Design a protein with these regions (language model features):
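Alpha/beta-hydrolase superfamily serine-hydrolase fold, recognizing
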Residues: 17-24, 45, 51-329
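N-terminal membrane-anchoring alpha-helices
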Residues: 1-9
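An N-terminal hydrophobic leader/cap segment in hydrolases
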Residues: 8-54
Length: 329
C-alpha cells in the first residue's frame, strides 16, 4: 500500500537535519559517531512517561523500556537497533523504543549487540539469539507473547533472528515488525540506482556504511543470516514492513515481501510516499510518521487480538474461525 505524499519542501529541512545529526555520509570517527548517537537518543528519548532500566543479559548490556502507568506486562517487544551493524545502541534507539512502549502499552527490550568492525558476523546474530532466549528462559515470556522488531540493520537482524529460530527448531515469536530493513548486503536491488539521487540520507555517495559494510567480515554476503533476502520465509509469523519510497533500501523491503507472499505468509507492506530512511524517528512531527506509528499499534493489536477501549484499557478478544483464515493482518 502507498501512503500519502507530504510535500518535499515541508520535509526537506527535517531530512537534512536528520542526515547531519546521524553523520551518515560524512563518515566521521566511528567512536565519536557512536557517542554522538547516544547523545541524540538521550535527548530525543527523554520522556516523563517512559522508564529506562538497565539490564544485564549474561554480560551483554540491554535496556528495559516501559511506560510509567498500567500496561500489558504479559507481552514484550524485542527491538534490534539500527546503525549499519557498526554503530547504534539501546540508548540511541530510545527515539523508537520509547514510542513503541508508549504507543502499544507493552514493555520493550533493546539489547546492545556487539558491533563491527570489532565484532563481525555472527556476533550480532548470536547476541540477538541470546536476548530472545533470555526473555523466554529468565523472564519466562511465552514465545507467542513476543514480537521481534527492528529498524534498518536491526530490521535485517530481526528477520535473520527469526530464520535462525526456525532453522534450529525453536519456538517462533508472534510477529515481526521491521522499519526500512537492510536485507541485502550485496546491494543488488534496483532502488540502489533508481533512488541513488533521491535518498536524503544514503543517496548521492557510496561513502557510507551501506556500501562498505564491516559486518560481513570473511563471510559470504549472500548468507541468509547476513542478508535475509537470500533465505526462505517459510513458516514465518506475520510481518509488518514499513519503508519510504525515496530510500535506496526500498527494494530490500519489496523483494523480501514478494518472497513472503510466495510462501502464502501473512504480511502487510506499506510504502510511505516521499519518505526517507526510518522516517518514524520524526515521531509526531510529520503526518506520515504519525500514520506509521498508528499502523504499528494496530498491527500489534491484531497480532495479539486486542481491542482498546476509549479510556485506554485493553481486553483480549477471541479469534473466530473466519479471522484465523485471513492471510493478511
Amino acid at each position: 500500500a502507498l501512503v500519502g505524499k507530504n510535500s518535499e519542501k515541508n520535509n526537506q529541512n527535517l531530512m537534512q537535519l536528520i542526515r547531519r545529526a546521524h553523520g551518515l555520509v560524512e563518515n566521521p570517527d566511528l567512536e565519536k559517531h557512536r557517542q554522538s548517537q547516544d547523545h541524540i537518543g538521550e535527548l530525543l528519548g527523554n520522556s516523563k512517561e517512559i522508564q529506562y532500566r538497565p539490564v544485564d543479559i549474561d554480560g551483554m548490556d540491554a535496556e528495559w523500556v516501559s511506560v510509567n502507568r498500567a500496561h500489558m506486562k504479559k507481552y514484550v517487544i524485542l527491538h534490534c537497533h539500527g546503525g549499519g551493524y557498526s554503530t547504534g545502541s539501546s540508548i540511541y534507539a530510545r527515539t523508537l523504543t520509547s514510542k513503541l512502549a508508549a504507543g502499544t502499552s507493552m514493555d520493550v527490550l533493546c539489547f546492545d549487540y556487539r558491533l563491527a568492525p570489532e565484532h563481525p558476523y555472527p556476533a550480532a546474530l548470536e547476541d540477538a539469539v541470546a536476548a530472545y532466549q533470555w526473555l523466554i528462559g529468565e523472564k519466562h515470556y511465552e514465545a507467542d507473547k513476543i514480537v521481534i522488531a527492528g529498524d534498518s540493520a536491526g530490521g535485517g537482524l530481526a528477520l535473520a533472528l527469526v530464520m535462525y529460530l526456525r532453522d534450529h527448531g525453536m519456538d517462533l515469536p508472534a510477529g515481526v515488525l521491521v522499519m526500512s530493513p537492510w536485507t541485502d548486503l550485496t546491494n543488488s536491488g534496483k532502488s540502489y540506482q533508481t533512488n541513488f539521487n533521491r535518498d536524503p540520507q544514503f543517496g548521492g555517495t557510496t561513502d557510507n556504511m551501506l556500501f562498505h559494510s564491516t559486518y560481513i567480515g570473511d563471510a559470504d554476503p549472500e548468507n541468509p543470516y547476513i542478508s535475509p533476502l537470500f533465505g526462505s520465509f517459510e513458516q514465518f509469523p506475520p510481518i509488518l514492513f514499513q519503508v519510504g519510497s525515496e530510500e535506496v533500501l526500498l527494494d530490500d523491503t519489496l523483494r523480501v515481501a514478494e518472497k513472503v507472499r510466495k510462501t502464502h505468509g501473512k504480511l502487510r507492506v506499506t510504502v510511505y510516499e516521499g519518505m526517507f530512511h526510518v522516517f518514524q524517528m520524526a515521531l509526531r512531527l510529520i503526518p506520515e510518521s504519525r500514520e506509521a506509528w498508528d499502523e504499528v499499534s494496530h498491527f500489534l493489536e491484531i497480532i495479539y487480538c486486542i481491542e482498546r477501549k476509549k479510556e485506554g484499557k485493553t481486553v483480549k478478544r477471541v479469534k473466530s474461525g473466519r479471522e484465523r483464515s485471513r492471510r493478511e493482518p
